[in-house]
From Swiss-Prot:
Subunit structure comment from the entry: The Rab3 GTPase-activating complex is a heterodimer composed of Rab3GAP1 and Rab3-GAP.
Originating organism: Drosophila melanogaster (Fruit fly)
Protein's gene: Rab3GAP1
A Gene Ontology cellular-component term: cytoplasm
Protein name: Rab3 GTPase-activating protein catalytic subunit
Lineage, opening ranks: Eukaryota, Metazoa, Ecdysozoa, Arthropoda, Hexapoda
Region of interest: Disordered: 530-574
């Protein structure tokens, strides 16, 4: 039986098992050592209000304790790197003073703004002014918070023991009770000193504890050691003025009964004015408001100087040395809401046909013809069929109502805004006659010219999505837009509101597509004009039908296939030495092998325009084919082959060197031989074996431009553009229009600020928005980056504008103050986090035309009813000079926040741990 016993499975009792408390201590100790809490390098004094303006770094670790675990957070202020001032360095002579002691005694960080502008600032930093501290709390504090005294003692004792073991100089707090109460208990250790932190709250405090006299008595009772010097006090009182509302009613372009006037809200009505019409809404929601607080501060007083009790108080606004006004704005703009709503379209993957049905363009020669390239081979006399379809399209198809929430009259009004020339009876906003490039820098934002067709369309789509039918209304407008484009093409009319010239790849893709459509219309009109001009000059005896066919051959390019494009017919072969297609002579240059003949510049085909996506597709194809592929050479040299064939037709006796002299003069180099004679020869890249130029020259035959195959088929390219626009899905339409939309929104806001004469006040914010949009528009990623940060900045600027209008009214403009005075003080609000100084007796006396003079009538009234809180801080610091034994007694700190009958006490009392 004994032989069957396995020693490995034999049970052994572990007598060294640790308790939960010891395990927790070990885990917490490892975390504190990793954070290096025993060092105290940052011992310089804090600047005034530095705690409230600096950035914070928060590190988190999780421990498996108390059901769902305990989270340990290390909060640390990121201070500017500055060397200690000499006078300050001399002051720091006691090794027992830590940064925690300095922070508790710092009067410059006693009171922060009454409005929490940043959620990152922890309440312990606001109450005690600490630059770094550690907090322990349950992982889900709202569900599993600490309730019992045993839990408090468990963690607080662990914190005290671990702090002593690792020699931590950072205060450590434990959050207790419900998190919304903000109750903490904590401890901070220093050599021979221990500071105990306690936070409590009373719903109804004793009357004597709501004033300074009673609080001083309570403070003296809590101080563990007797101090000979007087305590220093800091006091802050906060008053709330009436909430200010300014109604800026909603304005929606092409408003059909939309208005916010049915919501009755008290407040002054102020309509926003703009110089340039933009199809985007503006105004602010009725619930927008600005809350105004007056904060008076007594930064540092001796306890024997001031008196404060139920009977009499010295802490009244008229006696305050420092007074500030804070403006808390909650404003929501219809413009920002419209842009945020438009973001949702990025997630809509439905096709346009699912909203408006198939064949919404109203003609059968649309997307279907372009989408089936086999028709070009199987159909006979395709060119003539196209010519017949280019005449007036079917009016029944074009006037067919598009499905959607808008009526025909409403849709016609929107189309009149986009195409004013096509609806002269309804056009209210014609396009500017001056050059579109005057107001737009394409090197910056990859958008379109302001108030161009692209910008108007983008704004209309966003407005329709927000106010005129959601996604269905947006799809209806886009379908009507593409149908109008097809109507313009079928009638050989230029698209209005688009920059002239080839597709500019510095602009957005939608603008490039419309530029391409205009180029196609221009080429088509030019080609048809040339054909008509030649047909009128023809004299012959052939029948009318034969004359028409012959005119087509002379006036238009042949749609021949690639194999026979260069050769032509036998009667037009390169063997003929009759020059054709000459444009003009190249100065007095002569052919190298025929000095008696001049060198002529041939009539060549115009360059082939391409949009950005086409260039990208070509690059991808050539990358896949590789550099050695013949197709790659053919793609790159199509235009070169056409020019060489035209040159040979114009100069039958010319050689490649003659062509290079005209086409690429830099490759015709001047050299000096051994005898000192100057000669010319081709460059090295032209004479390299297997040179592409030589191959193409050998392949090229003498074919004038009139008989060459067209490099650019304007008909096919126009149908491609129309097909592209008609087959976009909703999220693709969003990607095409979001950058011009944001660009127009920023310019609209700049226009509003300019009309209010505030462009100088907010110029830096506008410039930042444009710079951010520039980076966003030129992102190289396949997916558009998130526009949320830009929308947040835009909404913040709109809130600032609403805040200024309220501050302008508060300042008594225009009767009691000038606009320049209001702007000067509002600049301080922008710099100081919604705060403006109205009283500063340290620097100047009150008055002198400041906001204080305007608020005097309000201050002379009884302000007691407007008092919302009183904040008292009592400090007592014992240095080595105040005790007989030369011991540092440490800081004593108590803060009392009185709000009506409620009282919150926050104490930090230091005791000695040395045995004397």
């Amino acid at each position: 039986m004994a032989e069957e016993i396995d020693d490995n499975e034999f049970y052994r009792e572990n007598f060294s098992a640790d308790s939960d408390w010891e395990v927790f201590n070990a885990q917490l100790g490892e975390i504190l050592q990793k954070w290096d809490v025993s060092s105290d390098s940052e011992t310089r004094n804090l600047k005034s209000e530095e705690i409230f303006s600096c950035n914070w770094k928060v590190e988190r670790e999780k421990l498996d304790m108390l059901r769902n675990g305990i989270e340990v957070e290390y909060h640390q202020a990121i201070l500017e790197d500055e060397e200690l001032v000499r006078a300050e360095a001399k002051e720091i002579t006691c090794l027992q003073r830590t940064s925690c002691h300095h922070d508790l005694m710092s009067t410059g960080n006693s009171f922060g703004p009454p409005i929490r502008s940043s959620q990152e600032l922890h309440i312990l930093a606001r109450i005690y002014g600490l630059r770094r501290f550690i907090v322990l709390h349950p992982v889900n504090p709202t569900l599993n918070y600490m309730r019992s005294t045993s839990e408090f003692n468990f963690f607080l004792s662990a914190v005290a023991v671990v702090s002593a073991e690792v020699q931590s100089l950072v205060p450590i707090f434990v959050q207790i009770y419900d998190p919304k109460w903000n109750y903490y208990t904590g401890v901070a250790l220093a050599p021979a000193l221990r500071t105990n932190f306690r936070l409590i709250g009373l719903e109804k405090a004793p009357p004597e504890c709501r004033f300074l006299m009673g609080l001083l008595t309570l403070f003296r009772e809590k101080v563990p050691t007797s101090y000979t010097q007087a305590a220093m006090i800091s006091v802050c009182t906060t008053y709330a003025l009436d909430t200010m509302r300014i109604r800026m009613p909603m304005y929606v372009p092409f408003d059909h009964g939309l208005s916010s006037e049915d919501i009755v809200v008290d407040g002054e009505v102020s309509h926003l004015e703009v110089q340039q019409f933009c199809a985007l809404p503006h105004g602010y929601k009725p619930e927008s408001r600005t809350e105004i607080y007056l904060v008076y501060t007594w930064p540092e007083l001796s306890e024997h100087v001031a008196f404060d009790s139920e009977q009499r108080s010295d802490f009244v606004p008229a006696k305050a040395p420092l007074g500030k006004i804070y403006l808390s704005v909650e404003a929501s703009s219809y413009l920002s809401c419209c842009l945020r709503d438009y973001q949702s379209v990025a997630e809509v993957t439905r096709s346009l046909e699912s909203f408006v049905g198939r064949n919404f363009s109203g003609t059968s020669s649309g997307a279907e013809a372009a989408s089936n390239p086999l028709d070009r081979i199987t159909e006979h006399k395709l060119t003539k069929r196209r010519e017949r379809s280019f005449e007036l399209p079917s009016q029944a198809g074009l006037t067919k109502r598009l499905p959607g929430p808008m009526t025909e009259s409403e849709l016609s009004e929107l189309l009149a805004y986009l195409f004013p020339d096509m609806h002269p009876e309804m056009a209210l906003f014609p396009y500017a006659k001056k050059n579109f490039t005057d107001k737009f820098d394409p090197m910056r934002i990859k958008s379109a010219v302001p108030d161009s067709l692209v910008c108007r369309l983008s704004c209309l789509l966003a407005t329709c999505h927000a106010h005129l039918g959601s996604v269905e209304g947006m799809a209806q407008v886009w379908a009507a837009f593409t149908r109008q484009l097809r109507l313009l093409w079928d009638n050989s009319l230029m698209v209005p509101g688009i920059s002239a010239g080839f597709p500019d790849t510095r602009t957005c893709l939608l603008h490039q597509k419309l530029q391409m459509l205009n180029v196609c219309v221009e080429r088509r009109v030019q080609r048809e004009a040339n054909s008509k001009r030649k047909s009128e000059g023809m004299v012959g005896k052939a029948s009318s039908e034969e004359e028409e066919d012959e005119d087509d051959d002379e006036g238009e390019f042949f749609d021949c296939d690639d194999l026979t494009a260069g050769a032509g017919s036998p009667t037009k072969a390169v063997l003929s030495l009759k020059p054709e297609g000459r444009l003009r002579r190249l100065n007095n240059e002569r052919l190298l092998e025929e000095p008696d003949e001049y060198l002529y510049i041939p009539d060549t085909q115009e360059p082939v325009p391409k949009t950005e996506d086409q260039l990208q597709d070509d690059a991808e194809v050539m990358l896949k084919l590789g550099p050695g592929s013949g197709l790659t050479t053919q793609m790159m040299c199509t235009s070169l082959l056409s020019d060489m064939e035209a040159f040979k037709a114009a100069n039958p006796r010319g050689i490649m060197e003659d062509f290079i002299r005209w086409y690429s003069p830099k490759d015709w180099e001047e050299v000096t031989d051994e005898l000192g004679q100057v000669k010319h020869q081709l460059s090295i890249r032209m004479t390299t074996e297997g040179n592409t130029w030589q191959k193409v020259w050998e392949q090229a035959q003498a074919v004038p431009v009139s008989r060459q195959k067209r490099l650019f088929d304007d008909t096919n390219e126009a149908l491609k553009v129309l097909h592209y626009l008609e087959t976009r899905k909703m999220h693709e339409i969003y990607n095409l229009t979001v950058i011009p939309l944001l660009h127009s929104a920023i310019l609209k806001l700049a226009d509003i600020l300019s009309n209010a004469e505030l462009e100088d006040l907010f110029s830096s914010q506008i410039e930042k928005l444009l710079s951010d949009l520039c980076r966003l528009s030129r992102s190289h990623s396949d997916e558009l980056p998130s526009i949320k940060p830009l929308l947040d900045d835009l909404a913040e600027l709109e809130r600032r504008f609403y805040q200024f209008k309220c501050f302008e009214r508060l300042s008594g403009y225009p009767k009691r103050s000038s606009l320049q005075q209001v702007k000067l003080q509002f600049e301080e609000i922008l710099r100081n986090d919604n705060c403006c100084t109205i009283v500063n007796r340290r620097l100047t006396a009150a008055g002198d035309g400041t906001l204080y003079d305007i608020l005097i009538p309000k201050l002379e009234e009884d302000m007691a009813d407007r008092l919302i809180s009183k904040d008292y801080i009592i400090r007592l610091d014992g240095d080595t000079k105040t005790t007989e034994k030369g011991l540092y007694l440490g800081p004593q700190f108590m803060r009392a926040i009185v709000t009506g009958e409620k009282l919150r006490l926050c104490g930090a009392f230091t005791e000695s741990t040395a045995f004397v």
